């Protein structure tokens, strides 16, 4: 049997911008963090331009697109304003996510089933512009099937509930959530979708999920930025890459 396809690491730099914005000014610079992550082995950079601009700002996206040597993944809500901005930036990819101003971080997956009327045209516009679109969704069959129906090239499976259950020591819930991810990744791949995953991943959970051969990209940020305070960003990227490689070595294509 053949080995699983290569697994990409997208490093999310949002919380470098969170730290910068705590005092204002330009330091620490998210672009510098992107350079460091790429030098350490990141395959791409992810940044979320939220409507309230709480961390990443418009100018950050422009600078990232202009200056980094790896693909830029532009996370965004599917609003008219954000679509306009993304089409102007022309990133390699966009990831459409749900967004509420009162949340601390993205709390759940996108309701693709309930928002087909607005998401379909947005996906079509990005496809026409040559920008790969992924939809950040729970590993739910109806959501996955609708994503394929809308001709989204990719999905990103929300791993937060699984990671939270592991952190909370709830083995039963963790197993239930893992089975959903396992089945969802297989269903998405069989539907012709490229499969990514992210949210709440640390070294251990990244290693585990890397065993799933259908998944070709992980987008990870908060854990690595937190660890970087103690050991440096380059070291955290290398450690995450090593964890993913250990998991991938156990995976073989079905």
Curated annotation (Swiss-Prot):
Q: Which CDD domains match?
A: PNPsynthase
What reaction does this enzyme carry out catalytically?
3-amino-2-oxopropyl phosphate + 1-deoxy-D-xylulose 5-phosphate = pyridoxine 5'-phosphate + phosphate + 2 H2O + H(+)
Q: Which InterPro entries match?
A: Aldolase_TIM, PyrdxlP_synth_PdxJ, Pyridoxine-5'_phos_synth
Q: What class of enzyme is it?
A: transferase
Is Cytoplasm there in the keyword field? yes
Instruction: Kindly list the GO CC terms recorded for this protein.
Output: cytosol
Catalytic residues per the record?
48, 75, 199
Site residues, Transition state stabilizer: 156
Q: Where in the cell is it found?
A: Cytoplasm
Pfam families recorded for this chain?
A: PdxJ
Residues reported to bind 3-amino-2-oxopropyl phosphate: 12, 23, 200, 221-222
Look up the EC number in the record and give it: 2.6.99.2
Q: Which family does it belong to?
A: Belongs to the PNP synthase family.
What is the protein name given in its UniProt record? Pyridoxine 5'-phosphate synthase
Q: Which gene encodes it?
A: pdxJ
């Amino acid at each position: 049997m053949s080995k699983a396809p290569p697994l990409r690491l997208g490093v999310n730099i949002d919380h470098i911008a969170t730290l910068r914005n705590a005092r204002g000014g330009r330091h620490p610079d998210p672009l510098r963090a992107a350079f460091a992550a790429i030098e350490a082995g990141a395959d791409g950079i992810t940044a979320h331009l939220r409507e309230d601009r709480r961390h990443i700002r418009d100018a950050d996206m422009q600078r990232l697109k202009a200056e980094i040597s790896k693909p830029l993944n532009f996370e965004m809500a599917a609003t008219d304003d954000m679509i306009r901005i993304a089409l102007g930036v022309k990133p390699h990819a966009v990831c459409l996510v749900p967004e509420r101003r009162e949340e601390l971080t993205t709390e759940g997956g996108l309701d693709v089933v309930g928002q087909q009327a607005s998401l379909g045209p947005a996906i079509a516009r990005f496809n026409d512009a040559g920008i790969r679109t992924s939809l950040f969704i729970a590993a739910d069959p109806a959501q996955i099937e609708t994503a394929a129906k809308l001709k989204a090239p990719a999905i990103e499976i929300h791993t937060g509930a699984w990671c939270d259950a592991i952190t909370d020591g709830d083995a039963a819930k963790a197993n239930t959530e893992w089975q959903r991810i396992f089945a969802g990744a297989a269903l998405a791949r069989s539907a012709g979708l490229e499969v990514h995953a992210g949210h709440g991943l640390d070294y251990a959970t990244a290693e585990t999920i890397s065993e799933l051969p259908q998944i070709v990209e992980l987008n990870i940020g908060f854990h690595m930025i937190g660890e970087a305070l103690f050991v440096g960003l380059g070291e955290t990227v290398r450690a995450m890459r090593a964890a993913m490689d250990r998991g991938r070595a156990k995976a073989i294509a079905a």
